[in-house]
């Protein structure tokens, strides 16, 4: 099984291009099922989850053509949904990636029927699908859960309605939003997720002919249309990858510019990096972080839905706090079981105390390399970050988690001066 070996001690310097956002491209690929003509998606990252989603679309009968492109420009995917013949997303594919549930709304809206296996693909606690089910029922769907599958049908077109999400759910918002686009009449979604990836999904569907207002706010209004046509959409940059490289620069006392970024989607993260002592300058599509000659200061944070601090950056900032000056308190309010990286960071010499959903991190003068094991996507990133500043070699096992969400991370870090390699 492949591993990554990191040798610590190098301050990162240089520039890095940010890839398309994993959490945007997956729902956007699902949204192509709503169209009745080919849809081209560009700036698609080279990720394992994207490959899985392409397999799922192909399993449903869609014709998918991939232009591999380059690391510099990203890949392009052309989806022709006119050949879709199946409306069942099988367990074999769904179990490896939770985002597979996002075909439920499009299949139901377009074909009046959908069967999607209950999802797997993530070890960071329960992520209930009830928000998806309730939202689709509010549009007139009949839904049952039988034999491990969500089975949804509608008699004729879905009907527009008003739905208030019990809790903020990104994928729940996306699933119901996609279904509402082809529903008859007006749909109002309240307490909707405001993440930039939701806005990007809406922008894609608007380009195909959807009528959506309010994406990026808690209230989204959709005027249903009869059909979506073909078109093109470029995926927005990945704000979590952006944040990960900025934290790497801060931890190593480096100076890094991230290009093809969207600074306006990173306010909470940039505020915390400034609090940690970094000097940050931004342009419309780049961010430069300078921490040369300085040790980061510890920061305290609480994860919450956008625009607050993202749970997907919690592990990386914990790694920063492990070598920072002072004590940082991290409260995780989004997911349970999202401190699984703590035991691995402890193996490197970190000083972390966990009490329920709170981690208290006391900065250590140094970490020392050791063999560690990745437990989920963002945890694996935090271990690489810790390895960048640890004495000696840090060997990270189970890096298949990493390939689900980071495109060529060892190449990108290596280009910034890190000593990092993938081994068989």
Swiss-Prot record:
EC number(s) on file: 2.5.1.7
Matches recorded under CDD domains: UdpNAET
Molecular function in Gene Ontology: UDP-N-acetylglucosamine 1-carboxyvinyltransferase activity
Function: Cell wall formation. Adds enolpyruvyl to UDP-N-acetylglucosamine.
One GO term of the biological process aspect: cell division
Pathway of action: Cell wall biogenesis; peptidoglycan biosynthesis
2-(S-cysteinyl)pyruvic acid O-phosphothioketal modified-residue sites: 122
Uppermost EC category: transferase
Cell cycle found in the keyword field: yes
Residues annotated as binding phosphoenolpyruvate: 22-23
One Gene Ontology term, aspect cellular component: cytoplasm
Protein name: UDP-N-acetylglucosamine 1-carboxyvinyltransferase
Places the protein is found: Cytoplasm
Keywords: Cell cycle, Cell division, Cell shape, Cell wall biogenesis/degradation, Cytoplasm, Peptidoglycan synthesis, Pyruvate, Transferase
Primary site of residence: cytoplasm
Active site: 122 (proton donor)
The organism of origin for this protein: Xanthomonas oryzae pv. oryzae (strain KACC10331 / KXO85)
Domain of life assignment: Bacteria
Gene symbol of the encoding locus: murA
Source organism phylogeny: Bacteria, Pseudomonadati, Pseudomonadota, Gammaproteobacteria, Lysobacterales
Transmembrane segments: none
Catalytic activity: phosphoenolpyruvate + UDP-N-acetyl-alpha-D-glucosamine = UDP-N-acetyl-3-O-(1-carboxyvinyl)-alpha-D-glucosamine + phosphate
Binding site for UDP-N-acetyl-alpha-D-glucosamine: 98, 127-131, 312, 334
Similarity comment: Belongs to the EPSP synthase family. MurA subfamily.
